[in-house]
């Protein structure tokens, strides 16, 4: 959804979760344990990444499909729980803010990475709804997944992200709360664009 908003506004787009997935992928490929915060932070600082034409590249290799597996989502959540890793990736994320603007997608974008953002939106939906959407995305990309497994992994991720000591997942008062359980992607995009234009006009 955030990418659709960025396209509509002609802004740059940051998928912050991809940076944590890339760190996790690099660590797993090199056999690093995901509980070694110091080593993970070093990997995060040295990542050779590029985003081109909707694809993600790591050290010159297209890793787009590998990043979108459920396994990598779980690994990324584990990696993101380490304050050392978050600190290393903070400046890399902030470097994406370039004219004419940026739409950043991530669980701590408004609270930590861009606390001065002119518009913050806290997106949520029932876990079952998010699981259905995620399952559809995976199947469309040819990645088989069982619905109960997707639901369970989302619940675990929510629990981890809400309880981590640094940048826990929660709704902050200065962010618009948008529940998309019964709202289509098109409707959600329209709501965010309308809010942005209202603020720009005021």
Region annotations inferred by a language model:
Residues 13, 120, 175-177:
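Conserved beta-strand scaffold positions in the cores of enzyme catalytic domains, especially
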Residues 1:
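Hydrophobic positions on the alpha1 helix immediately C-terminal to the Walker A/P-loop
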Residues 191-202:
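C-terminal alpha-helix
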Residues 64-143:
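ATP-dependent NMP and nucleoside kinases share a basic, alpha-helical "lid"
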Residues 16, 20, 37, 41, ...:
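Amphipathic alpha-helical transducer elements in NTP-driven molecular machines
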Residues 17, 60, 89, 103, ...:
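Residue-level signal for inorganic ion chemistry
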Residues 43, 53, 93-100, 107-112, ...:
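Small-molecule kinase domains that catalyze NTP-dependent phosphoryl transfer to phosphate-bearing small molecules
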Residues 4-70:
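N-terminal phosphate/diphosphate-binding loop that engages ATP/GTP or pyrophosphate donors
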